[in-house]
Amino acid sequence: MNSGSSYEAMERYLEKNKKPPKALFISSDATAAGILKSIREHGFLVPGDCNIVTYNNTTFSESSTPPLDSIEVYLKESAKEATFALERFWNAEKLPRKIVIPCSLVIRGSIKKQENNGK
């Protein structure tokens, strides 16, 4: 999904539901750009009315308004593990059942902490 199609999708969502979802996990910054534009054009706040986390932590996440919280993915390590898995496969070696590649959450300001209110 790109910025234009995500904008149109959020426009349809807001037309039907009259308010944005409380939170969105968005798979790319290009998608986030369109969604963020639509939400703001309707007068809703990010964070507040809608909280957003993106995936990949590109420069858009850092430079957008507001700066977006994002999952930092370590592509070098992912590529290295994929290469090792392919080598094992080609050599008819047993492949690991699970490969865990760390990631981290970069906090910038697109998530509003919810008040507990004693609950």
Give the label of every model feature segment:
Residues 1-5:
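Short beta->alpha junction loops
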